[in-house]
Amino acid sequence: MAMNHPLFSQEQPQSWPWGVAMYANFHYHHHYEKEHMFEKPLTPSDVGKLNRLVIPKQHAERYFPLGAGDAADKGLILSFEDEAGAPWRFRYSYWTSSQSYVLTKGWSRYVKEKRLDAGDVVHFERVRGSFGVGDRLFIGCRRRGDAAAAQTPAPPPAVRVAPAAQNAGEQQPWSPMCYSTSGGGSYPTSPANSYAYRRAADHDHGDMHHADESPRDTDSPSFSAGSAPSRRLRLFGVNLDCGPEPEADTTAAATMYGYMHQQSSYAAMSAVPSYWGNS
């Protein structure tokens, strides 16, 4: 028998169109999510010898309407699932004497098995039914001490700050006037790098002084502990003989050099003592 329906024609595969399949998949996930209905803190009478749970009227009429007829007179059997997936069946009815909606048959067994006490909380959830299937009902409970913990949000995780790098300076603040004199141009650097560069420059500067000391100056008779020896400085490829300088002036010059070097590369070069006029 030939099939003239476009879904079963020879030109197309015998399957649902892509759009229909995507809609069915979305419809399935949309209708199978748990919806929180309400919760009820248990009173001493809810867990006492009356063997019944009073459901607040506004929640009972909204989620478990009895309607009219035999359901209103005799009640209904409501089926639930607990957290472990175990089934629970309760008789649900309306008591005209107290004008309240209650769960009666099956409730006492639930209280005993879950070991519920006054102050504990029972909560109800559902999954909306679709395609002619009724709602799936769920029941759960939590202890009285867990109620505050469930409502209190967890504190945010602590943020661990990485320790500062070693030899990063005495916590110098960032300054846009820190430059590096290495390379062809002047680029901003961090204070830690600038501090390390100043220490390296000062160390190299001191080594250059000691390396260029003439042996004949240190071994000469005129050399003594009380008098400062003359030193030879090699600057820009030229050997220069430098006379003794007061120690205070040397410290001041080194301090000025470090400060000016932190400001800019040009200022660092201008802070170096010039000996061209003495040669």
From Swiss-Prot:
Keywords: DNA-binding, Nucleus, Transcription, Transcription regulation. GO terms for molecular function: DNA binding; DNA-binding transcription factor activity. GO terms for cellular component: nucleus. This is B3 domain-containing protein Os11g0156000. It comes from the Eukaryota. Residues 148-182, 203-228 are annotated as: Disordered. InterPro entries: B3_DNA-bd (IPR003340), DNA-bd_pseudobarrel_sf (IPR015300), LEC2-like (IPR044800). Residues 38-144 bind DNA. Disulfide bonds: none annotated.
